[in-house]
Amino acid sequence: MMKRAFLFIALCCLLLAPASFPQQKKIKIIADQDSAGPQGTNFLSLLMLLRAKQVDLLGITTISGDQWVEPATVFALWATEITGRTDVPVIKGAQMPLLHTQREQELQEKIYGSYVDWHGSFNPDAPAPSETWPPPGGYPKVKARPGRAADFIIDTIRANPGEVILYCAGPLTNIALAVRMDPGIVALTKGIYIMGGSSNGGPELNWWWDPEAAAMVLREPWKEIVVSPFEAGAQVVSSERLMKEVVAAGGPLAAHVRQQYLESPPLAGTTNWSMMWDELLVASIIDPTVIKKSERMYLDVDVEHGSKYGYTVVWKPDGVPQFFLPYSGPRAPDQEKWRSHLAPPAQMHEARVQMEVDVSKFEKIFVNLMSD
């Protein structure tokens, strides 16, 4: 009887004791970003990464793209200040593409016509590369860490072998430089998540701005390549309704969102609302189920300096066409021959390309991260 009583008491103690679960390991990330601000996809995605409790943000490396690297660095530093994360280092990266120049682009457009609406730092009315301007409230007090972005990427990956995810939401110049300086980091990287390119084979700014860098990076044998193309991010759009939800939820970023999105009228010829390309990439790292459908593809970039310089090149090995009429005679298509025909060159590597987004889930993740 005493033994039963003892067992009963012990069981009650176990049931009443607080549950003890192993702490979930944080995702180690280096964010490589053309961090234009104080609004837009580049800046909001940085705020998400800086606020995410699931993320161990090891550093932010800046790059030219939507904005020159000098102002991009200013806004990346400011992002660390307004999120209370000045412990995260910001390292300035490359100012120019590996080969592509604004002058060459202008000449190409004279010959072939203009096929990209937005040129980023190559816009004809873009400021000078050295020009900066203060964020709301003035320039950040925190300074960029001395050194080169490529060196920081190399050193950080080698210090955390097999653990680091590269989040790449701008042109891939810094990543290409790091890989050329130390090819061994590719095998030591957990995975590379890239916002860029087009699943339909068209132009997109990040890869178009530095085609050679994008081609170099895509041809490396990373353990995992995840690409969020233009078409995926186009499914989620910032809106007054969404930003009102962020403000209503409260949190340290509510004032910033209210001021920048709900109280500040846009400049002439601009809008406060945009597609949320980079934010989607952040959300998919934190919760992969936000992507309802992905496809297996092999991607490259056209680096021939012709009419399609910078275009995405796509191989879809699973894309055997479905014939509605028996044009090949009374026999079914030869699946193996088609797959062999559609196979990419040997130097290409498989990527998981995001195709369909759970918009409702994405919006919940965005609001939670921005208000937590």
For the regions a protein language model found, what residue spans apply to each?
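Boundary at the C-terminal end of the N-terminal hydrophobic targeting segment
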Residues: P18, P22-Q24
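Conformational coupling and interaction surfaces
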Residues: K25-I27, L47-A52, D56, W208, ...
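Short, mixed-charge aromatic SLiMs
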Residues: Q67-V74, L98-L99, S198-G202, D300-V320
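Short, surface-exposed amphipathic charged segments that create phosphate/polyanion-binding patches used
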Residues: E104-G113, E204-W209, L242
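Active-site histidine-anchored catalytic micro-motif
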Residues: Q24-T86, N123-R241
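Surface-exposed loop and adjacent secondary-structure segments within mature catalytic domains
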Residues: V88-P140
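Bacterial N-terminal signal peptides
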Residues: F8-A17
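Bacterial N-terminal signal peptides that target proteins for export
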Residues: M1-I9
